[in-house]
Amino acid sequence: MDDLVWFVRDRRYQGSLKHSGVIIPVAHRETVFDLTGAEVAATFRLLRRVKAWMDAEFSPDGYNVGWNCGRVGGQELFHARLHVGRRKWIR
């Protein structure tokens, strides 16, 4: 977390998505395309920190990382956020 972006975990998910979350800008930005250059840089700095934490805590087999932009793009809340989900093979 810094002055420009935060990581928020969603504790509702279970199984392979437990402790997944979103990186959101502090300032209101509707989509990723509205972020400032500084917010984009801060987002990706924080993404590296989130990945390091998830690697250390959960040893995931992979990740889903992505943005939903606009209603037709699957966006339901109109505040930009980068979804970060860890994945584990369930055998």
Where would I find each of the regions flagged by the language model?
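HIT superfamily nucleotide-processing domains
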Residues: 1-91
